[in-house]
Amino acid sequence: MLSVSRAATRMTGMVARFSAGGHGDGAGRGGGSGGSIRDAGGAFGKMEAAREDEYFYKKQKAQLQELREHIQEEVKHHEGQLENHKKVLERHQQRISEIEAQERALGKE
């Protein structure tokens, strides 16, 4: 009968053996099943893993480009709003000056 420590030692060795390997090396290695081609491992599994990596790289790159364009549009929009607000502010200040001039004129009468 095996002692607990010997069983644990044997299990550790088995786990290390089954989890060894790289991305696309087959089922149980590198993160689990990824389909029948990846399950087989070997060159086809590695090629499929490389294609997946490339797909997600391109997807992330496209998302970042979309985000950059969206933020640039937002900046342009807010710059336009800033100019509009400056013009409105100048109009209001001009109107206040006119009202103050009218008040002074009324006070002199």
From Swiss-Prot:
Its main location: mitochondrion. Disulfide bonds: none annotated. Residues 55-109 form a coiled coil. Keywords: Coiled coil, Mitochondrion, Transit peptide. GO terms for cellular component: mitochondrion. It is found in: Mitochondrion. GO terms for molecular function: ATPase inhibitor activity. Residues 18-39, 73-109 are annotated as: Disordered. Residues 21-35 have a biased composition (Gly residues). It comes from the Eukaryota. Pfam families: IATP. One of its GO terms (biological process) is negative regulation of nucleotide metabolic process. Thought to be a regulatory component of the ATP-synthesizing complex in the mitochondria. Activity is pH dependent. Mai-2 and tin-9.2 are transcribed on a dicistronic transcript where exos-4.1 is the upstream transcript and tin-9.2 the downstream. Belongs to the ATPase inhibitor family. This is ATPase inhibitor mai-2, mitochondrial. It comes from Caenorhabditis elegans.
